[in-house]
Amino acid sequence: MTIMITTGNSFEGKVIKQYLGIVRGIVVRSPTISQGLMGGLKSIVGGKIGAYSQMCEHAREEAFQLMIEHAQALNANGIIAMRYDTGEIGQAGTEVLCYGTAVII
């Protein structure tokens, strides 16, 4: 089933028939030893930390997919007000949360 997703509060030209509640996907990731070493070196000399960027992008995509699976479990065909949030888990990890409101349109 295809789910329409928007960061807005509605879908243009569509009527929301039912609000099903909040759906979310949460992923916690920590860098590998090699990513940590490379990140540490990059932080000293400056520049983009590619390994960390890639890790964060994969975590965002995984959290997004988990949110979609949560919505599908509720038989939703739309998600409105989709957002990302991140936080640190100690010094070892990063949490990525993707959330929104599941709806039937």
From Swiss-Prot:
It comes from Legionella pneumophila (strain Lens). Belongs to the UPF0145 family. This is UPF0145 protein lpl0253.
